[in-house]
Amino acid sequence: MLVVVLLASVLLLADGRAVAGEPHAAELVPRVTAAYPPVGTLAVAVARQQVPGSGLSLRAAEARAARVAAAAAGNAAAGRSFPTASMVKLFVAEDVLHRARTGRLVLRPDDPALLEDMIRRSDDPAASTLWVRYDGARMVVDVARRYGLEGTAPPDVPGQWGQALTTAQDLARFLSLLPVVAHPDDAASILAWMRAATPLAADGFDQRFGLFGTAPSGTAVKQGWMCCVGGSRHLHSVGVIGSRVVVLLSEVPRSTGYAAARAALTSAAAAIPPPPP
């Protein structure tokens, strides 16, 4: 109920109707799932990114929010828990900016650069600094509460931020709601950093896989990779393609190398059409 009231209060303009020329999310998810080779598990979630507006009655806003929610789709693994790897950096960035915006913390001089590097270059030391500085576990809990993310939780081992848990449907919900839950300037910053993702990460890992390997230039993306929690290798990719949010979370056996995992995730991402002109 809290989320419904929140969505109604910001008076959404986006709705769940398919954009002309785009397949419906329920049609797209099976295509993406089928394009993933049998190397591991792929979770897929697709949603429409929402935008704030004005001029709707409460009833109309609630109806529109319901259509947006109904338009989201996922495969059988969309609600399965995965270690976040670097996806948690999105939560950290949003919560640091939110707490600074609401007067709950004062940004230090180096924080803006750390936040940007953490998203654009997937900089792990930057993430670790912010995690320790501002209580990362608390940040994950706070974001999960404010966005209604039921499958998202901090890591069991303190400090191991990449082992926080989330689901594809939670990440899709987060990116869908970002423009209407976060302050517009904060949402714009996060999405701008995602659009400016660097081909090589801070640690030298090539980020051009999954959605970053197939979506049009300038697409807002975030990549994640990690080995080897529970004997598995994880490779994740999320993006906002036009007005569509796409989340791909993958898990392969440790014996499957990054090259094969990257190729598999990129194959799945290639099934997603570009946005209409």
Descriptions of predicted regions:
Residues 1-20:
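Secretory targeting and sorting signals
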Residues 93-97, 128, 172:
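Short, hydrophobic alpha-helix immediately C-terminal to the catalytic nucleophile
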Residues 101-150:
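Conserved catalytic neighborhood of penicillin-recognizing serine enzymes
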Residues 61-62, 66-70, 93, 113-120:
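A short glycine/small-residue-enriched secondary-structure motif
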Residues 16-74, 131-277:
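Penicillin-recognizing serine hydrolase domain
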Residues 80-105, 118, 246:
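Active-site SXXK
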Residues 96, 122, 250-252:
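Short, histidine-centered active-site or binding-site loop motifs used for metal coordination
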